[in-house]
């Protein structure tokens, strides 16, 4: 690869930029960013890239295009770049929900052009190019989506690319991806948002300074609840069916805990608590533990 175009230079886009430069993967990196404030930050930070405003001259000369925007931005951008795309160009994204976005891409992308979707399991509650870090993807999973019409050559090239920046690569189809991450990432984020809302509602109801005394649990959940609201709205809406199913399962288990507490069912609640500890041990054994809780960043 000689040239890469990153569309969207927030946390993920700027971290990719830094990582690509660190690993010396390509000669030139182009950035397309619609936010004027982000463009100012990119220039102030002196990030090693060329910020572009026009796709026409650039797209035919890039080897890889990476969408690092919210899911709701995909359609507009595809329509802008479609006529300049070449079959040789590898196109990917870093979105956290796949089935609906892949359906949209199939409808809007011109014939003969291939899109191979990626999902690096990395992130932070902060956003913007000033928060990007070069080692964000190091030793983190990156899921590549393989469908019936996936271009195998592009898939291999993307796998090689993500491994070069330090990611561990796994391959699955979009349906399995959305099912898995509805539970491991999307539900934990939804719980975080709702826990913080519950805490603020409870504080108003009791008229206590509750937030002031946040313990580790609420503090860590509040960090996740500070994540970008547009990005997470898009994820919730795009993975609506799977998320709704895991919400129902969560409510069922929450009510079961409530019943055990109200009836002081010692045997049942101890069994539940022990079983959840086993999952924690498994996470540590699989080396999925980190110093700073991130509740399945995506």
Region locations from a protein language model:
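Glycine-rich, N-terminal phosphate-binding loop of Rossmann-like dinucleotide-binding domains
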Residues: 68-70, 95, 146
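Rossmann-like NAD(P)(H) cofactor-binding subdomain of soluble oxidoreductases
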Residues: 77-130
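NAD(P)+-binding Rossmann beta1-loop-alpha1 motif at the extreme N-terminus of oxidoreductases
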Residues: 1-60
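Internal alpha-helical scaffold of NAD(P)-dependent oxidoreductase catalytic cores
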Residues: 134-220
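Interdomain hinge/lid region at the active-site interface
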Residues: 207-275
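Rossmann-like NAD(P)-binding element
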Residues: 56-85, 89-90
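Residues at the starts of beta-strands that form the adenosine-phosphate
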Residues: 3, 27-28, 114, 141, ...
């Amino acid at each position: 690869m000689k040239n890469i175009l990153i569309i969207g230079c927030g946390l993920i886009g700027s971290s990719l930029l830094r990582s690509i430069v660190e690993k010396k993967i390509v000669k030139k990196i182009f950035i397309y960013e619609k936010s004027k404030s982000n463009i100012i930050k990119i220039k102030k930070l002196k990030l090693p890239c060329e910020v572009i405003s026009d796709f026409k001259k650039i797209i035919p000369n890039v080897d890889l295009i990476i969408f690092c925007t919210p899911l709701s931005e995909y359609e507009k951008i595809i329509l802008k770049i479609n006529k300049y795309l070449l079959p040789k160009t590898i196109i990917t994204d870093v979105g956290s929900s796949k089935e609906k976005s892949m359906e949209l891409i199939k409808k809007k992308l011109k014939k003969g052009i291939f899109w191979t979707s990626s999902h690096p399991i990395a992130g932070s509650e902060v956003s913007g190019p000033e928060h990007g870090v070069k080692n964000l993807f190091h030793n983190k999973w990156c899921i590549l989506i393989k469908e019936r019409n996936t271009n195998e050559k592009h898939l291999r090239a993307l796998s090689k690319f993500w491994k070069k920046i330090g990611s561990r690569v796994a391959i699955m189809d979009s349906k399995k991806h959305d099912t898995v991450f509805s539970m491991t990432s999307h539900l934990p984020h939804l719980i975080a948002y709702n826990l913080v809302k519950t805490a603020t509602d409870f504080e108003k109801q009791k008229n206590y300074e509750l937030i002031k005394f946040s313990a580790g649990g609420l503090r860590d959940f509040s960090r996740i609840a500070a994540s970008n609201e547009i990005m997470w709205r898009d994820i919730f809406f795009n993975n609506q069916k799977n998320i709704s199913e895991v919400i129902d399962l969560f409510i069922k288990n929450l009510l079961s805990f409530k019943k055990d507490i109200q009836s002081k069912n010692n045997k049942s609640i101890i069994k539940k608590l022990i079983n959840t500890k086993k999952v924690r041990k498994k996470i540590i054994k699989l080396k999925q533990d980190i110093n700073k809780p991130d509740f399945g960043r995506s």
